[in-house]
Amino acid sequence: YTQTSAMLTELKRQEEFAFLKAADSIALQQSLRDLDQSFVNFFQKRASYPTFKSKHNRFQSYRTVNQKDNIRIVGRYIKLPKLGFVKIRQSMEVGKINHVTIEYTPAGKYFAVLNVDFEPEPRPNAGGTIGIDVGIKAFYSDSNGNTVSNPRYLERSMRKLIREQRRLSRKQKDSHNRGKQRLRVARVHEKTANQRNDFLQKQSTMLVRENQTICIEDP
């Protein structure tokens, strides 16, 4: 990291790489730290060899650290280094911000993922015990005789995804219409994934809150 950080400083002095001065310097340093950690993980055989992340990838992200309150939420805006105040839709109240990751998804949306300090509230011991049998026709059945079906809206979304993917396959490669259709497919993909995650989160949260012990069949 020390060597690459010195190289970055030298590159900023060169006219060819003057654009680096326009970027958030902390974000650039975090990228170098990520690269350093990736090689550490590789040489310690905890991960595969790091791969090049092209600027043309459909998913992009960068991380920057809060220093001297340079990242903060004010009303309906978040202040980011080099970008200033950006309007947001805030999903929940947050505490002290440590760092933020800005993500750009294939569906053309931006997300600010915040790492914050907060004090978790311990929940009372539910005391219940339940057994879960995951099925194919039904999502699962439990030892209390309850059955949870797979959501129909998820099936509809999957059918729509298949239709949009077929339309994409018929578009001419590198055409403007193919680009627009690719964005439609990405948005349906994202909606389907969000629906699935929302369903799973709600079911798992309900089971954990109502039971102290959960047994599930080993597949």
Which stretches of residues belong to each language-model region?
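Nucleic-acid substrate recognition interfaces
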Residues: Y1-P219
